[in-house]
């Protein structure tokens, strides 16, 4: 029996964040008749500091901190995040309660002049702010110039259209959700550019309150949850933040969980890869096993060098 009549969602103000929050609002109101859901839009530090690469100012956690403070202060009941922005650790009293169904997890190649990444001429300028993409692009195409690109999806597309870049790389999920799929020139296969941990999935964080957890439970997608938990366990075991060249992508194949992961030097000079399979129920164990394979190859040395810079 539901006693709660209303629920407040903390969200960032970017168009994509608002799309995600409205998606969760619509799902909740459809499932729970009579529940009134309101959005509490907030500005985060990551939205304000746009002239500095994320890795230098504390990484993706900057998009989450203010929302978590709103939960802890009781100003909101749940927070909706892109899973790839969610840090590995949660403040005391908060939890990741729900992972919703994943959109396309691949990276999108967006260009007004070229059809694919491999068609770009030598010396072409490619925009991405992600060290994960940077290291994989540099290994694939060491002849390209990779320049930093920050801002929301609309801002990034405008910079491309202004001629600042020959191409930019964005998460396909964001473009699809914003109704901008026509801007996707081509999708980059995961064998060429392995996605970020949690890419394409929406997660819901809340206080550790049974009533709220029950409200959110129907929104969980079991398949996406298993995949993202495996990816995050791998990242956590490597003690990888969001601002390091770590990639991880799991799928369910023939009833088993299949996880691929990599750790790379930012310049693409070395990329370590590992993969593994397990029962779907053993997602977190699989993540740790794959991380161990990377550590045996020397992943910790690459990461220590990055952290010391």
From Swiss-Prot:
GO annotation terms (biological process): protoporphyrinogen IX biosynthetic process
Superkingdom: Bacteria
Cofactor note: Binds 1 dipyrromethane group covalently.
A Pfam family that the UniProt record links to this protein: Porphobil_deam
Keywords, in A-Z order: Porphyrin biosynthesis, Transferase
Record-listed E.C. numbers: 2.5.1.61
Assigned GO CC terms: cytoplasm
GO molecular function, one term: hydroxymethylbilane synthase activity
S-(dipyrrolylmethanemethyl)cysteine: modified positions: 242
SUPFAM superfamilies: Periplasmic binding protein-like II, Porphobilinogen deaminase (hydroxymethylbilane synthase), C-terminal domain
Catalysed conversion reaction: 4 porphobilinogen + H2O = hydroxymethylbilane + 4 NH4(+)
CDD domains in alphabetical order: PBP2_EcHMBS_like (cd13646)
Gene3D superfamilies registered for this protein in UniProt: Periplasmic binding protein-like II, Porphobilinogen deaminase, C-terminal domain
General remark: The porphobilinogen subunits are added to the dipyrromethane group.
NCBIfam families in alphabetical order: hemC
Family statement drawn from the similarity comment of this UniProt entry: Belongs to the HMBS family.
Function: Tetrapolymerization of the monopyrrole PBG into the hydroxymethylbilane pre-uroporphyrinogen in several discrete steps.
Subunit and interaction comment: Monomer.
HAMAP family: Porphobil_deam (MF_00260)
The name this protein goes by in its record: Porphobilinogen deaminase
Name of the coding gene: hemC
């Amino acid at each position: 029996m539901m006693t709660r009549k209303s629920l407040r969602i903390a969200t960032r103000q970017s168009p994509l964040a608002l799309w995600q929050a409205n998606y969760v609002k619509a799902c909740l109101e459809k499932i729970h008749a009579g529940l009134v859901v309101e959005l509490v839009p907030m500005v985060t530090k990551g939205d304000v500091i746009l002239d500095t690469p994320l890795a230098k100012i504390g990484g993706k956690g900057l998009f989450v901190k203010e929302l978590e403070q709103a939960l802890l202060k009781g100003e909101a009941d749940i927070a909706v995040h892109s899973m790839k922005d969610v840090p590995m650790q949660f403040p005391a009293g908060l939890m990741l309660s729900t992972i919703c169904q994943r959109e396309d997890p691949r990276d999108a190649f967006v260009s007004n002049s070229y059809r694919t990444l491999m068609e770009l001429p030598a010396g072409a300028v490619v925009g991405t702010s992600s060290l994960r993409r940077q290291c994989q692009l540099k290994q694939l195409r060491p002849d390209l110039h990779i320049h930093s690109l920050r801002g929301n999806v609309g801002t990034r597309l405008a910079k491309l259209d202004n001629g600042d870049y020959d191409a930019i790389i964005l998460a396909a999920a964001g473009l699809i959700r914003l109704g901008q799929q026509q801007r996707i020139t081509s999708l980059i296969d995961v064998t060429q550019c392995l996605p970020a941990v949690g890419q394409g999935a929406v997660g819901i964080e809340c206080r550790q309150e049974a009533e709220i957890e029950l409200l959110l439970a129907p929104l969980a997608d079991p398949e996406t949850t298993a995949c993202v938990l495996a990816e995050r366990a791998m990242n956590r075991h490597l003690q990888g933040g969001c601002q390091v060249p770590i990639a991880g992508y799991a799928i369910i194949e023939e009833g088993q969980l299949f996880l691929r992961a990599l750790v790379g030097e930012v310049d693409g000079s070395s990329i370590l890869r590992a993969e593994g399979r397990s029962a779907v129920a053993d997602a977190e164990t699989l993540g740790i096993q794959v991380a161990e394979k990377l550590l045996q190859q020397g992943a910790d040395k690459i990461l220590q060098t990055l952290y010391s810079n």
